[in-house]
């Protein structure tokens, strides 16, 4: 199944990239556990990492600090490695309210969640790829450190089928039910199977557009074929096939029975403790809830909130780390932590918040103490489990520098020849009027401006002031969710408005080549918003424009300002030297705006499989890119209905066309959520 990594790119490594690639590869081959790549904005860090992956041929996990950046990286990696398995592993919840108890008001909040089926399918596809092949790049968010089904149990539960195998129909159906597939002879969808005489059709949970047909004859597997579930068109026949469980959390029956006995023992011990402390209500509540869960597990093999019993189901001891995506990564895997100065602290913070909530549930009799072991990994456990790691950041944190022994691989020179922004320090007294005149200079030549303030009040007042003076301005604040934020960024790039005002403004992440000026108000007020790292990241937002400039308004130069200015000057000088030596003329980036919400061109190009007559599909992405996630979801439901109608009328050409449109819309929906 495994192929070799093949890197597809119109460019060759240039600037600092060849040296960075060589040093990273040498470090990995010498067995260095930690390396840091200091790559400035626009220097092609992702391309460098893609080259390292292609040269070393090792399965890789890329950790991003949020879904937005993960989607962007996934799109880029998909374009670099179209022939290999590039997978996406982020939280599959569109909405998630964990169960919680508020003692002060005696309020119990039930767990409530809405699962995005398409992302769930992509998660299952990611683990399947890691188990089956080596040419895998998984782009993940911090969701990767949360508990996942045990890989050993997951492997045990698989159903292996080969042509000529002796197995009767009922045994296959029983095994499919154990894998949590449901029988549905009418609506054939992901995670279901249907039976027609001696033919069983299975729609694998990790598949998006291919189903399996099992044809039996006299208790023998006569033929295995892969077909298009919409049109019924057989794509190919295969000698063997492995059906993976519908969820990561499936458990063999004998393990469930054993777990139930262990849960009963813990319940008996916990009841004694609660009764000894005269907590009668809590004891009664815990007994009732646990007995109900045990009954459900006995009858169905699972229950609502079964993850709270994960310690027993995976057979781990008290306090042991939960199985996570890292358990699926091969021992010689590679870990790349993007924007490490943000991602590393996130990994450390997840465990504490989760524990505080669960301790209250345990104390008041809503959960057994073992529920505390259904948790994200602690930071120390992550460190112990992480394979060889490359930290990637324009501003590495103290942790990464310490782990790398102070050795940093520099990638300061940009292949495009673009220089770091020119930095000017100007007095605070006239900052608003000075800013207004600078904005007018930029808007006259169709360039954009970012302004970062220290307080919400200041941001609101400044927005109002600029509006009164006829500027097209928007204000970005913490109440705006990820999707709306991406829409605002897209509108800024498209020129719907010219000035974006915010507080902790867009430091790590999305590229905005149209921004030529970054103005930092009150830059001389020391604090986390004006630290060296924050200043460098904010200044970097103007580094993709040929006329990039950063203005720091302050009456004195603080140590953080001095370091940020010094570091930017160092990078600027190094780039200038390189440009002169190689006769490079800096070129501005011209990045399509549509790219923000799409997950790489590779995803949009769906093939019309085996149907030569299929008409060219209208690119759903172009008009759909304007839509909000809610509108996208509505459009998806609408098209699904039309597709089924065409399929029932045997109009397979039209149904297939709509299916291809749905592919594109779903990718846009993932990026937007």
Swiss-Prot record:
Single GO MF descriptor: ATP hydrolysis activity
Keywords in alphabetical order: ATP-binding, Cytoplasm, DNA damage, DNA excision, DNA repair, Excision nuclease, Helicase, Hydrolase, Nucleotide-binding, SOS response
Pfam families listed in its UniProt record: Helicase_C, ResIII, UVR, UvrB, UvrB_inter
Keyword Isomerase: no
Ranges spanned by the short sequence motif Beta-hairpin, renumbered to the chain: 92-115
Cellular component GO terms, alphabetical: cytoplasm; excinuclease repair complex
Localization (cell): Cytoplasm
Ranges where the UVR domain occurs: 633-668
Domain of life: Bacteria
Record's keyword annotation contains Nucleotide-binding: yes
Protein family per UniProt: Belongs to the UvrB family.
Classification via HAMAP family: UvrB
PANTHER family, per the entry: UVRABC SYSTEM PROTEIN B
Subunit-structure text: Forms a heterotetramer with UvrA during the search for lesions. Interacts with UvrC in an incision complex.
Name the record gives this protein: UvrABC system protein B
Organism for this UniProt entry: Klebsiella pneumoniae (strain 342)
Lineage: Bacteria, Pseudomonadati, Pseudomonadota, Gammaproteobacteria, Enterobacterales
């Amino acid at each position: 199944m495994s192929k070799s990594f093949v890197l597809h790119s119109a460019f060759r490594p240039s600037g600092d990239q060849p040296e960075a690639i060589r040093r990273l590869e040498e470090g990995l081959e010498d067995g260095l556990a930690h390396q840091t790549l200091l790559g400035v904005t626009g220097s092609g860090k992702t391309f460098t990492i893609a080259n390292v992956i292609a040269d070393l041929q090792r399965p890789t996990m890329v950790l991003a600090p949020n879904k937005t950046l993960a989607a962007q990286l996934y799109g880029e990696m998909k374009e670099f490695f179209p022939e290999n398995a590039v997978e996406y592993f982020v939280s599959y919840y569109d909405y998630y309210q964990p169960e919680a108890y508020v003692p002060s008001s005696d309020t119990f909040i039930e767990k409530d969640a809405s699962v995005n089926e398409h992302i769930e399918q992509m998660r299952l596809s990611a683990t399947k790829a890691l188990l089956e092949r080596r040419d895998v790049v998984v782009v993940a968010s911090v969701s990767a450190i949360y508990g996942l089904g045990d890989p050993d149990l997951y492997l045990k539960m698989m159903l292996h089928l080969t042509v000529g195998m002796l197995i009767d129909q009922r045994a296959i159906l029983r095994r499919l039910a154990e894998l949590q597939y449901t029988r549905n002879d009418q609506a054939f969808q992901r995670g279901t199977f249907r039976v027609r005489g001696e033919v069983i059709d299975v729609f694998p949970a990790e598949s998006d557009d291919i189903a399996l047909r099992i044809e039996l004859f006299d208790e023998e597997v006569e033929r295995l074929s892969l077909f298009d579930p919409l049109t019924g068109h057989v794509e190919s026949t295969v000698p063997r096939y492995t059906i993976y469980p519908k969820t990561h959390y499936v458990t063999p029956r004998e393990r469930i029975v054993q777990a139930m006995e262990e849960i009963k023992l813990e319940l008996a011990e916990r009841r004694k403790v609660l009764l000894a402390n005269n907590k009668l209500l809590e004891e009664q509540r815990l007994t009732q809830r646990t007995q109900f869960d045990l009954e459900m597990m006995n009858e169905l093999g699972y229950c609502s909130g079964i993850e709270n019993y994960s310690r027993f189901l995976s057979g781990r001891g008290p306090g042991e780390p939960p199985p996570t995506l890292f358990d699926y990564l091969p021992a010689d895997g590679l870990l790349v932590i993007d924007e490490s100065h943000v991602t590393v602290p996130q990994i450390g913070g997840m465990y504490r918040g989760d524990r505080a909530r669960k301790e209250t549930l345990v104390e008041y009799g809503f959960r057994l103490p073992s529920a505390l072991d259904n948790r994200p990994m602690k930071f120390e456990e992550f460190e112990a489990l992480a394979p060889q790691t490359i930290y990637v950041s324009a501003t590495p944190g103290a942790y990464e520098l310490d782990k790398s022994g102070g050795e940093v691989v520099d990638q300061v020179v940009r292949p495009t020849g673009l220089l770091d922004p020119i930095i000017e320090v100007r007095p605070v007294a006239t900052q608003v009027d000075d800013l207004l005149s600078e904005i007018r200079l930029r808007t006259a030549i169709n360039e954009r401006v970012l302004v970062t303030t220290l307080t919400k009040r200041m941001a609101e007042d400044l927005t109002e002031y600029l509006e009164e003076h006829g500027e097209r301005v928007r204000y970005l604040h913490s109440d705006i969710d990820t999707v709306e934020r991406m829409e605002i960024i897209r509108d800024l790039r498209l020129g719907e408005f010219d000035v974006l005002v915010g507080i902790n403004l867009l430091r790590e992440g999305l590229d905005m080549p149209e921004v030529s000026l970054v103005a930092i108000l009150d830059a001389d007020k020391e604090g986390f918003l004006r630290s060296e790292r924050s200043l460098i990241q904010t200044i970097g937002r103007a580094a993709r424009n040929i006329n990039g400039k950063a203005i720091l308004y302050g009456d004195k130069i603080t140590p953080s300002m001095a370091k940020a200015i010094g570091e930017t000057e160092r990078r600027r000088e190094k780039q200038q030297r390189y440009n002169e030596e190689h006769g490079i003329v800096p070129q501005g980036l011209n990045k399509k705006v549509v790219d923000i919400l799409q997950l790489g061109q590779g995803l949009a190009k769906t093939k019309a499989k085996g149907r030569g007559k299929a008409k060219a599909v209208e690119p759903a992405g172009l008009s759909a890119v304007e839509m909000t996630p809610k509108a996208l979801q509505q459009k998806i439901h609408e098209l699904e209905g039309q597709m089924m109608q065409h399929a029932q009328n045997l109009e397979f050409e039209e149904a297939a066309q709509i299916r291809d449109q749905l592919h594109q819309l779903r990718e846009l929906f993932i990026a937007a959520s």
